[in-house]
Design a protein with these regions (language model features):
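Transmembrane beta-barrel domains of outer membrane proteins
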Residues: 13-17, 75-79, 126-130, 173-175, ...
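Outer-membrane beta-barrel translocator domains and adjoining extracellular loop/strand segments
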Residues: 36-45, 98-111, 150-157
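Surface loops and adjacent helix of pleckstrin homology
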Residues: 28, 89, 187
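Acidic glycine-/aspartate-rich tracts in secreted/extracellular proteins
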Residues: 93-96
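Membrane-embedded beta-barrel scaffold of Gram-negative outer-membrane proteins
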Residues: 85-87, 91, 114-170, 174-184
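Signature of Gram-negative outer-membrane beta-barrel scaffolds
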Residues: 1-81
Length: 187
């Protein structure tokens, strides 16, 4: 088979500094995804021929998937002191069927081409601090990622939209130099 995926995007992001302590980030992104997959039926491809009983070896079928999305991001940062910040952010994203075609994953087939795109919302609250005269960076964040139209492959090998999934998490990080001779990176 032959698969071709194309994407076009336009992205705008602005950081608005109200004063040295408060910064607002606002962004919008438009994505246009296009995937085309052409399959040539072969005499030994029993599964494909079984799905299309009238197919003969050498016949070709082409499946297309074209979608476009508008996604957003917003964040606010408070810097109580110069070496530390507290932030909150919100972002959306989308993942249409076939966008990852050609990289060894699902691509597009007649069975999944009409599935709904996965849509994601991510919220995060975190803090970042530079300590030891800016030699060490400490970070901590809690986050929630909510996905609608989640795709999953069942025991029978078919892919379907299974509804909503949610991930709640915490992320901790340490990066920098503890002393002139000791460096640390963990997270």
């Amino acid at each position: 088979y032959n698969i071709e995926s194309k994407s076009k995007s336009v992205y705008f992001l602005d950081s608005i500094e109200f004063n040295p302590q408060w910064i607002l980030d606002l962004g919008v992104r438009w994505d246009d995804y296009s995937t085309e997959q052409t399959m040539t039926y072969g005499a030994r491809n029993a599964a494909v021929i079984a799905a299309t009983p009238t197919a003969q070896a050498g016949d070709k079928v082409t499946i297309n998937n074209d979608k476009d999305f508008i996604n957003y991001q917003a964040g606010i940062t408070f810097k109580p002191v110069e070496n530390g910040s507290i932030y909150a952010s919100y972002a959306t994203s989308a993942n249409p069927v076939g966008v990852d075609g050609g990289d060894g994953s699902e691509g597009i087939t007649a069975a999944i081409n009409n599935l709904k795109p996965e849509e994601v919302r991510t919220m995060e609250l975190g803090t970042k601090w530079d300590v030891l005269n800016d030699k060490l960076n400490l970070t901590a964040a809690i986050f929630r990622t909510e996905k609608t139209n989640t795709r999953a492959t069942g025991d029978d090998g078919t892919t379907s939209n299974i509804g909503e999934t949610r991930v709640d998490g915490i992320e901790l990080g340490v990066n920098g130099n503890i002393t002139d001779k000791w460096a640390v990176s963990a997270g």
